[in-house]
Amino acid sequence: MTSYEMAKEKYAAWGVDTEKAMEQLKKVPVSLHCWQLDDVMGFDNDGALTGGIQTTGNYPGRAKTPEQLMADMEEAMKLMPGTAKLNIHASYAIFEEGEFADRDALEPKHFAKWVAFAKKHHMGIDFNPTFFSHEKVKNGLTLSSPDEETRKFWIEHGKACIRISEYFARETGMPCVMNIWTGDGFKDVPADRMGPRLRYKDSIEQILSEPYDKNLVKPCVESKVFGIGVESYTVGSAEFTLSFAAMHDGCMPLMDNGHYHPQEYVSDKIPAMLCFYPEFALHITRGVRWDSDHVLLLDDETKEMAKEIVRNQALDRVYMALDYFDASINRVSALATGFRSWQKALLMALCTPNEQLKELQDTNQLGRLMVMQEAVKMLPIGEVWEEYCRREGVTDDAHFYDAIEKYEKEVLVNRN
């Protein structure tokens, strides 16, 4: 009997079918963010990263061209079990020699190479308008700017992205989640908190007035508590985005678990959201004291978020995407590690006897519940994970970095 077969029997004694869990997991799409591989630089300008976000580190091997980025993503995907979607920002438009279009004039043709990449790997594509790192971010504002010319530019950018999102969905045959997030806000105490939000509301409404198939494009709005240089006031607050999505049919809220106060837990917010929203989106990251976007690991909050999605039968209601960027380590490793961590969290949740534990809570057997929750932590999930990786044709954790190291020595170090 193999170690997996013994683990399978132990789980069966708890009423858990590990075969069913693995079968479910491999079908769950998780969106894979391209910006980990190039430190959120993009291809449409050479300026510095702005928008209240920051990458730290200078590890060699950053992708500097579309070809390099796609090669790195392919290398990372070789190490990932399960189903991945591609997640790109508008700033990753790919232009032919001598060609350029500003963000308000982007067209589907500028993303044709991404579609070819996605089709090659049987992936869907999610999309993000890029409301940062651009000369037309005026005084830190885009969609909420009091300057109508500035605001109009960014509204047109959003509309262009709606059209591009529908192109992605039609080409790949999978819905495209289009996330609207801006870093709009103020460093110090504002004199008017409502005005920028009214302009922001109007701008998003204008973007969503662009005709699109609601079965193909899934717009969402993302909140944030603060960013670098916008510590005192963020236009797109949690209350704003939740209210906007609730009042606009077809628009979802998006929660990034790094975009809240450190003592707020998105795992607690997930079941609350499921009470009211048919669907919503999630950006999964790891914040250390703030929205630092560290590489996702199998930490407590990661596991708790996965639990809430799984035990509330919401795998088909929550659009899951990774969002972090670390320039201090091998970027291919960072991308693959985070993806594998979320797969582990989902697998653990799928291998939890959720109904048994719920029954103990509902019958007020809270002492027994605590003991059983602790006992579940000691079940042999590692053996199930290794079997899942084996079936998916990817390496186990013990040998995971060997492939990364080989790629670094053969490819990445030569880029500098």
Model region roles, listed by residue range:
Residues V189-E301:
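Acidic/histidine-rich catalytic cores of soluble enzymes
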Residues G183-G185, K224, Y324:
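Short linear capping/connector segments at secondary-structure termini
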Residues M1-P146, F153, I162-I164, R170, ...:
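Alpha/beta catalytic barrel-like cores
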Residues K159-I162, M174, R197-I204:
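Extended substrate/RNA-proximal surfaces in nucleic-acid metabolism proteins
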Residues A169, P175-V189:
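Aromatic- and glycine-enriched pocket-lining scaffold segments that form the walls
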Residues T150-F153, N257:
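Catalytic beta/alpha-barrel core
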